[in-house]
Amino acid sequence: MERLDKILSSQGICTRKEAKKLCSSGSIIVNGCAVKKSDTKIDPEKSEIVINGVRLEYKRYIYIMMNKPSGVLSASNDKHAETVIDLVPDEYKREGLFPAGRLDKDTTGLMIITDDGDTAHRMLSPKNHVYKLYRAELDAPFTDKMKETLESGITLDDGTVYKPARIKSVSSGKTTVEIEICEGKFHQVKKMFAYSGANVTKLKRLAVGGLFLDESLKECDCRLLTDFELGLIFDSNNN
């Protein structure tokens, strides 16, 4: 059971303060009866909630695919810079949204935004081996020695350990490489390539597990994930 105002806020319908006004005006009907108090507790999954004549399609959690642009922070909020949450359309906004994992400010591509902490933890935990696929553009040709270094795992001078990566493809010009990692440490892909002898000049995330970025999404755009797409993240055949 949850408070009605919390339910409406979580679904992006209105703020809790606005919910109080809606209730006072008789605009909210629950199971056929007007609810006058916004702190009334109901079961949102078993109740019919109608706001101004429109039935609420309740979703316990929301999962959003975004094509993150460069220059935007992977954070819920920031006083000085634009964040991925700022880019979420009003129709998807609700309390508790956060990016499931981080991309560097200048990294683009697949970002998953949700309010489901358990699913995000499952996706990000290294023990679950959910691989993330990136396309890296380099300032030097990619060599067999670099491939061997990356696929063997790396230990930096400061003691940071990176698990072995998987090289999926290399462009004919040898300067664009698709690489998979199952971790998400700070600047990991850039640091791994730098250790192997090349600097990353551009980085884009293409996939998480078996879920690939919808290429029809322009940078800054987003859409909801289907249940099937959500399951692809954890498809063992892709991890």
Feature names for model-found ranges:
Residues 1-239:
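Basic, flexible Lys/Arg- and Gly-enriched helix-loop patches that mediate nucleic-acid binding at interfaces
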